[in-house]
Structures are given as structure tokens and as C-alpha cells.
């Protein structure tokens, strides 16, 4: 963190400056940090002198007056006031300093002020223990002091910078600056400190020995309940290894970035999530420890000590007898297998096999499972609602869609991608594993040719083979000696493969390295050759998701300027007729044809507005996305996919695309306006934040039908949540927001009934089943935190089964008012998703059929998840949906709600209030 004024260099500490900032010498802990986290610890105030027994109550330990003075001084360093007991004089905690700045004793504090300080840690030993448990590198500074002196620094900070605690505590962080530090970035930091706001950015800092390093700095303010600024927490992450550094400004001749991926946005997303944990510890260390215990321990006190990376093959409660689904792995799911297969999953569950032996079919198993038992294992005796969130930022963060990595970035192999269309065929992408293997930083190799790996013992004839393959645009696999940055020699099984575009022209070269300790014979190398070739094929497929880096910037958005043609089912609506009238006049639909009415929402890349097509009375929703933000956040291919997906949709429960166009700064999509708003708002408006089961059944059934249609089109939705379910005037749903969806090809299939007697089968209702699903799996890290499936977190590759997991979470939220795996932080939520058993509170009455449906949808193994074998047909046939007329669901009347979707006012007026504001961007 920086303050006004600059301090050049990065060496030592002046004693005079320390004395001016601190004014006096305070006690230090074993590392030398000030004991500012221990103002109320009894051990700090107890005296070794024995007090007269007759004058002392039982267990009372008198304190010396000077100890309390020292404690008051320590508390003052934090802008706090020490509170003491009226009778014993023992320290009882701390309270916030009044805004006037005058220190008052506890006897002068009124209850209002004590309540306003409730968000400040009062049990310092707990706070100290909580902070010491974090592995992050961070400092805490005093925001009440104009120079923002450091009051606490973690051990990681000393290790990263090389400074000692005596050289850090009491100083401003500007001593990390140097000649290469960007002054514009420092100005941003100063502005954030002055405004008491958040900051996240990458700056060049210097260690004590003068070594420069890239520091991803995240600053967050700590305020009391009255909004008074008390502290700043600054978390540092050294990202020199993985950031593109100053190469982020290097562009191609076409004006686009030379690097295939922009890493700053990725790293900032991770940093913001990590700093939220620290903020939680500072505000309430006790709740942090308690919630940790509740999260990591089952009710039986059995410890679930697995880390988030240790993914169990089954939950402890998931025995074969408790799952009723067909677990065979489908051949059509062509996964990108960048992690080892988790064993053979083709074995049927014990319950299913046993029932088959008894002659009971699938339906019989269902009926048997729905028989009530004396003791239902799915019901939790305690109502374990997740903790509430006082932090508004955290509440918004956990409900927004996240895009943390593309499939290409999650391939954990040593490889680079080069572009032969640029001079000297430079590297434009390098995997993290490649950086680890070669010991180079990403900044050091982007834009360079791969020859820097060569050394004195590298065989020139082998290098010539690689050059010939590049010239001939052919594949080649060789073994050669390469060298790491430190000069370490290693044998490299290297595979070069050209990547071609749709026209057959070479777009990139993919280079995959398999390191070894020694040269291996050709026969022994065959296994390695197969591995590197398979990896190259996966890289080729993953890289094709991204836009061609050699395109002109205007070509990236060309698809959005295409005319949208009406699909069969919607072409005769009033909205389409109004759009067609404009097109028939010879004009292209653009921003000038719409009048802004009001904003409907906003996100990371743009906003949604309610607009009226001029002089028609027809209202639409316009989604406007900022081009520059899309480029910086690696979302160009997401926007392209969303435009393609919307063009395919022709379904009553999905949006209709009427037009798309672009301005100099934005791309715009025109779709249906749903006056009923979000299902999330409807849920929130209900008295208990939940829906009755008949309403849940209605909305869930329409979601199933919509997902079935998407899967038949080869679309994996990947962002199902109440915020993305909009409601039409008639109360029916429309899924929206496809920027995180995956578009691939589809494989339709027909399953014949098992009964060979066709007439008998039809009599029993066993008709042929149509089933279609997306053929190719993805491995992108996308979704919404609370709804993300386990296989997305682990990076094992995911299919359309992630949508059925999200359906289970949606059902749970509609029935119970919250999601089952929500945690205080993103990391804890992900850990819960991977390890925590699903439980159903007994305080809310939910039918056994509903609980069993959620239980089967929330199976961590996607191969055993309900819907993995027959898709939506499996879910439609579940007893929870008994009574749903699936072919006529569109004609079903929406259920009555405690708080109706619309008030008694004129429905046409809802949300259509005129707004004269015309600047939407």
C-alpha cells in the first residue's frame, strides 16, 4: 500500500522515521510484530506478585495499573479504546474510538457505541490465531493514521520481501517501490486509500536485496458498523512466474494482444476471493473458527479432514444400495482425459442388480425406494442453515457467474503454442506445467522462439528435423537434450503438430514436451509418443474454442452484425413483425431504433436495459457488452458462442433473438423482455423465502424441458440459477444468459424398450425413448459458485450432467430458501461441494420424493447422477413429477403463490415506467 509522497529505493529503515510514526516503543511478539492483536488477553495483564488473600475474591487476579496503561496504548494503535470492568479493573475488551478522536473509558461508552463496535475483533487471542492460520502474504495497516503505518505483517510477507519485522512494522509499504514501479498504478492505490475503497492491481515491487518481482496487490478496507474506516488489509501475491508482466502491452500487427490469454483478470479473480477470507477473520475470528468446525465436521463429530484436492470416489454415505441409477459410462461422452480415469464405473449398483434378480424392473425399484421408513436417513435432526452474510460484496460475489479458466488453461501438461504467421514463430501460450519444467517465467518466454531451450549438447540434426517439419507444416516427434533456465540438462520427448483452421490453413503449432532423465530406445518411447500425440489433439480441440489471434479486431465481432432471421415458431408474433418492418425498409437494426426505458441489471462485462422499438410499443431486453472488457477478460469466445446459441433457439421456455448489432464500444443483443422478472426476486418476496412444493414442481418441470431442448441442440447450459430464470407475463419461465454455455455437436439416439413384445410393452407404457446429449466434454472452470458441479472444480472434464447437478441445487434453494453447500468463502463453498454430505433440515416439511430426487441429482459421480443414462427422460419419470402432463406443460396454469407474481395493478404497467435517460453506455 502507498500513501501520499514517495520514497525511492528499497533498502533499510531510518530509526528516526520509526520513532516519529510510533512515538514510543511497544512490546513485540516472538517475530518482532507489535502486540496489537492482544489488547484483552488476560495473560498480558496478570502480575506475578501475590495479592493479599483476604482482599481478593475467589480466582480474582489483580492487575498492575501500568499493565492497563500499556494495554490502552496497544489498543490506541488500532484506533480502539480499552474497556475495563468497573469493580475488578480487568480488561473486558475494546470499543471503537469516537469520531471526535477523544479516548474514553468504558464507563463513558454508551450501549450504542458498544454495538457499533461489534464488528471489530474483541477476543484478540482468537484473532491472532485465526490470522496465523492463513498461508496468504498480507499486512494490516492503520487507516486512522495519515501515513497508513503497518501494524501487522504475516510471516509470508517477511519471506517474500526479505525484510525483518523491525524494518516493516510501523512503516508505510512504499519502501517496496523502486525505479520500475508504475507511478500511474501508485496513483490508483492512493486514490483507493483516500476513498476507503477496494483496489486490485499488479505492480512491480522490489525485495530487500533489490530483486524486482510482480506483486498482485489487493487492498480492502475494514470498517465498523457505522461505516468508519479503521484499517486496511493488503494481500500480496508474487505472480512473477505466471503473469505476462510488461508483455501484456505487446500487440500484434493487427492490434490484438500477442499473448493468447490475458492473465491479469484471472489472477485478480483469485485474489479477490482469497482476501475475503482475511476480512472475515479480522471482523469476526470466532465465527470463522466455528463455521470452519461446522463445515469440516459431520454432526457425529467425524472429521472430514480431506483437502479440497483429495476428491473421494464416493461419499461415505453413498453405498451402492443407496443409489438407483445406471452407472455405465457412455461411449458418446468423449472426455478430455487430462486426469487419470477414476476406475471402472460400468458396474451396476448392488440394489439394482438385486432387484433385477428378483424380477423387479426400474419402476418397481422406484416405488420400493419411496416407501417411508421408520427413520429417514435423509432428514437432519438439526436445522443447519449456512451462516448469514453481512458483507454485501460477498453476497453479490457468490451469486455472480465466474469464468476462472478455459479448457486450454486447465490441461496439465508441458506444452507451448506458437504462431508461424508472426516473425520467428514466437510462443503465444505456455502452460503452467511448461513453466515449472523449464524454470522460466511466462514474461521471459512469451514472444520468443523455442530455441532458448537448446544448449551445447543439443543435437543439431534433430533440431533440423523440427525446422523441416515447420517449413513443411507437418508433424514430427523427436528426442533431444534441452536445458532449464538454471542450466539443468534433461531429455525431452518433443512432439510438434500443426493446428489448422476450418479452411485447412495452418493457424498455430503445438509443441508438447515429455521430460525424462535419459534417452530411451524407440520401442520404449512408443508409449510416450502416444501420450504426447493425444495431448496435442486435446490442445488442438481446446484452442479452437478461442478466437483466432490473427483476426482483425473488427472481425472478432463480425458475427454480431449479421441479420437475424426468424425461427418457425416465433415468426408471426407482434415483436417479430415490428422488427421485420424495419428490415423491409432497407435499414439495418441498430441502437438508433431503440428508446431506452430503464436498466434491468448489470454484470462484469456489460448491462441489460429495457428498450422500446421506436413508434411500435414493442418492448425488448437489450444486453450490451463492452468490447474492451471482453478482450481483457478473455470473453470474446464466450460472446461469440452466446450469439450462435441464441440464433439456434426456438422454444417457449428459452429466449428469442430478434437482432444483434455493434457500436464502436459495445456489442448488443435484442431478446424478449420478461416483465415477471427473476425467479430469484420472486423467491425473495415470499414470506419464508421458499415456495410450496406444487410451485417448485411447476418451475422445475419447465426447467427440465428447457434443458432437454438445449442438450438436444448440443448446448451445455452451465449457469442454471434463480437469477437466470425469467418469468413471462403468463407466469411461465424463460432461461437466459448463455455467455457461460458450451456449444458442441449432438448425438441423437433412440432406446427401444427392453420387453421384446411390442404390444405388451406399449400396454405397460414402455415406448421407445428419444435421447440426445452434447457429444464433446469441456473442462472450462465456469459457473456460479454455489451451483458448480464437483467435476468442474476438480478439472476432470464435464458433460451435460453438470446441468442436472445444478437442477438439484435449484430444487434445494426453492424448497429450503438457501443452497446446501454455501460457505463463508469461495474456497469453503468448493470444499463443501466436494466433501460435505447433503442433508435436509427437519424444520421444513418436504416430501420424500422431493428429497430423493435432490439426493440423486446431487451425486458427485456424474456417471451415477440421475440423468446420465437417459437424460431428461430419467428425471421426468421420477415420482416427484408424477401428475405433470409433459406434452401440454405449456398450457398448464402457473401455481398460486403467497405473494403473487404481479399485483392487482395493471400488468402492462409493470416495469414500463418511462425514463428520459438516453445514454445507456
From Swiss-Prot:
> What class does this enzyme belong to in the EC scheme?
transferase
Positions of post-translational S-4a-FMN cysteine modification? 173, 450
- SUPFAM superfamilies linked: Protein kinase-like (PK-like), PYP-like sensor domain (PAS domain)
Which ranges carry the PAS domain? 123-197, 400-473
Name the segments for region: Disordered.
1-59, 88-118, 286-347, 364-390
Q: Where is the active site?
A: 719
Q: Does the keyword Ion transport apply?
A: no
Query: Might you give the EC number(s) for this enzyme?
Result: 2.7.11.1
Q: Where is the composition biased (Polar residues)?
A: 97-117, 286-295
Q: Name the organs or tissues of expression.
A: Highly expressed in coleoptiles of dark-grown seedlings.
The record's cofactor note says: Binds 2 FMN per subunit.
Binding sites annotated in the UniProt record for ATP:
600-608, 623
Give UniProt keywords alphabetically. Answer: ATP-binding, Chromophore, Flavoprotein, FMN, Kinase, Nucleotide-binding, Photoreceptor protein, Receptor, Repeat, Sensory transduction, Serine/threonine-protein kinase, Transferase
Q: Which reaction does it catalyse?
A: L-seryl-[protein] + ATP = O-phospho-L-seryl-[protein] + ADP + H(+); L-threonyl-[protein] + ATP = O-phospho-L-threonyl-[protein] + ADP + H(+)
**Reported modifications of this chain:** Autophosphorylated in response to blue light irradiation.
Function according to Swiss-Prot or TrEMBL: Protein kinase that acts as a blue light photoreceptor in a signal-transduction pathway for phototropic responses. Regulates a wide range of physiological activities in plants that maximize the efficiency of photosynthesis, such as chloroplast relocations, stomata opening, and leaf expansion.
Complexes and interactors: Homodimer.
What is recorded about the domains? Answer: The PAS (PER-ARNT-SIM) domains are required for the binding of FMN chromophores.
The name of this protein is Phototropin-1A
- Organism name: Oryza sativa subsp. japonica
